[in-house]
């Protein structure tokens, strides 16, 4: 077949596909209609950089997992706050029935305009999530957590009943349905997951996430979050240093890491990130234990410098602008 005939046949096929499945259902990668990745910021400058595209990609499934009290829900709540700041609509599927509206409000969430569901079982949770995503009205949806998505058969059965693989099958079926819908509606779908230990593993990492393997495959981004050393004022623990690793990334290079402070009752410490990244990029000078910017002394010690940045919003904004400028040049 001649080249011109091939192109005609391809064009006719493309028109037929678009007629049946809608405009944009197939496109050439070089076309103008293939856009740059749209994102929702994470609420952390360091994590935005680690993700490579400036935040959580839209139209993708994200998994955030880690041990208990590592900051998984905090990270998801920050994403909701960022989406709302940009005028987006957010939903929270609270399968754990543990959502704290007062903590969410402190992190910047407009709780009065947040859609929340506390479903009775896993099937109901995922069905509600699918319908919300299918509406095309939701910008971000968080499911907290996969471990709490208990199948209806397990809830209605007796305590000792063995229901092996039910949750894994439920997740696999749900994700097959959700993936295409999430992509078409440009919704960011975040699943929070817990860690378990495999029994009898002698070599390698015994840790695994709940809900089977489906989420590992369908997620475009997987984030491993771990609490590190505590942040103290004398004997009082005020927060913890948190380490994050992007273990899977389909939109940018994976395995990048980020560190930030999570302060109890406040969430991610913005001032702490400005100090750390500013010092790393040479914007903030460190001489001994003193931190300074131009001729302004920020404080002796990191904690004092953090307080200075927190108390001066204009200075924080100026430094943040310089940090973004320096990072974009990299």
Swiss-Prot record:
This is Protein RecA. One of its GO terms (biological process) is DNA recombination. SUPFAM superfamilies: P-loop containing nucleoside triphosphate hydrolases, RecA protein, C-terminal domain. Can catalyze the hydrolysis of ATP in the presence of single-stranded DNA, the ATP-dependent uptake of single-stranded DNA by duplex DNA, and the ATP-dependent hybridization of homologous single-stranded DNAs. It interacts with LexA causing its activation and leading to its autocatalytic cleavage. Its main location: cytoplasm. Signal peptide: none annotated. InterPro entries: AAA+_ATPase, DNA_recomb/repair_RecA, DNA_recomb/repair_RecA_CS, P-loop_NTPase, RecA-like_C, RecA-like_N, RecA_ATP-bd, RecA_C_sf. SMART domains: AAA. It comes from the Bacteria. NCBIfam families: tigrfam_recA (TIGR02012). It holds the Pfam family RecA_C. ATP binds at residues 66-73. PROSITE patterns: RECA_1, RECA_2, RECA_3. One of its GO terms (molecular function) is damaged DNA binding. One of its GO terms (cellular component) is cytoplasm. Belongs to the RecA family. Keywords: ATP-binding, Cytoplasm, DNA damage, DNA recombination, DNA repair, DNA-binding, Nucleotide-binding, SOS response. It is found in: Cytoplasm.
